[in-house]
Structure formats: C-alpha cells, structure tokens
Amino acid sequence: MWVFGYGSLIWKVDFPYVEKLVGYIMCYSRRFWQGSTDHRGVPGKPGRVVTLVEDPEGCVWGVAYRLPEGKEEEVKAYLDFREKGGYRTSTVVFYPKDPSIQPFNVLLYIGTCDNPNYLGPAPLEDIAEQILNAVGPSGRNTEYLFELANSLRNLVPEDADEHLFSLEKLVRQLSEAHRNLNHL
C-alpha cells in the first residue's frame, strides 16, 4: 500500500515506510482551505493547513510512501487518527517524477468541504494573517507553511504552486512588517 503526502506528510514523516518517491497526482490543486484546531491552531482560533480541491487542470506534487508489508493497517489507523480533522480517503493515480517508473495507485487523504473544520476559500491576505497568528499543539502555523514551501522547492524545483508560494511570500512580508512595527 502506498500513501500520498501533499502537506505535512512531505516533511514530517512519523510513520514507518520502506520506500518513498517524489511525483504528482492530477485533477487536484493544493489549497490552504482546511482548518486545524488540533495541530496548527486551537478551537476558536484555527490554523490553516492544506487540502486538495478538484481541478481538471490541476497537478499536485508530493511524496508517495510505500508502507511496510504487514504494517499497512497499523499505519493506516495511525494516519486516520493523525488526519482526524475531517479528512476522507480516496485512491488516485500517482505519477512518479522518474519517468522510468510506471504510474500506480496511492491512498490520498482529503479534507472535504462538508467537514466541520473546512474553512474554504478566502482572500489570500486573510489566509496569510490567519496563518501568521495561529499556533497549536504541533507548533506555529507559519512553520507548517514554510516547511511545506521549502520541501517542495527542494524536491521539485520546477513546481510553480502559485497558491502556496504566493502565500509564503505574503506571510513573510506580513511577518517582517509586524517585526518592524514592534521595533518602533
């Protein structure tokens, strides 16, 4: 069994796996539209983490992990708990970056628009402010954003995830502006 990571599973892998491959899935786009009250925010002040939205022209880069034989159900149970904030699973085709490897099916966790933590679209400036100010049990929401952007830049330099990289730039600008205000 393979699992596809497109958010924190790219840079925060805390489950056993025997192989990992960089690649992409099609017909989705990555968006910071999922609320997080259990990792990067708290109830009443949620952070924002990524989910996938259907997009016929979309392409989402990430990492596929092959789970150890005999441990699939154990790891899946762990991931079901980790991704407990309103995610459902689906099976999609994964296209490895290495063209010599044939596409194959992966398990995908998606925060759907009908779950209680789904925040949906908002102006990029509002999303950036929310990420800048949110903190939860797993740390600052900015860490999540910056780790994801850095990881994707390192793994897939050719990826031009406009939503992610525009948001990263905006949050860095807002953070700098807040720092400058605090030093007046």
Swiss-Prot record:
Catalytic activity line of the entry: glutathione = L-cysteinylglycine + 5-oxo-L-proline
UniProt-recorded name of the protein: Putative glutathione-specific gamma-glutamylcyclotransferase 2
Alphabetical list of PANTHER family matching this protein: CATION TRANSPORT PROTEIN CHAC-RELATED, GLUTATHIONE-SPECIFIC GAMMA-GLUTAMYLCYCLOTRANSFERASE 2
A Pfam short name: ChaC
Binding positions for substrate per the UniProt entry: 3-8
GO MF assignments: glutathione specific gamma-glutamylcyclotransferase activity
Family: Belongs to the gamma-glutamylcyclotransferase family. ChaC subfamily.
Record gene name: chac2
EC code: 4.3.2.7
Function: Catalyzes the cleavage of glutathione into 5-oxo-L-proline and a Cys-Gly dipeptide. Acts specifically on glutathione, but not on other gamma-glutamyl peptides.
One Gene Ontology biological process: glutathione catabolic process
SUPFAM superfamilies in UniProt: Gamma-glutamyl cyclotransferase-like
Active site (catalytic residues): 83 (proton acceptor)
Gene Ontology cellular-component annotations: cytoplasm
Keyword Lyase: yes
Alphabetically ordered keywords of this record: Lyase
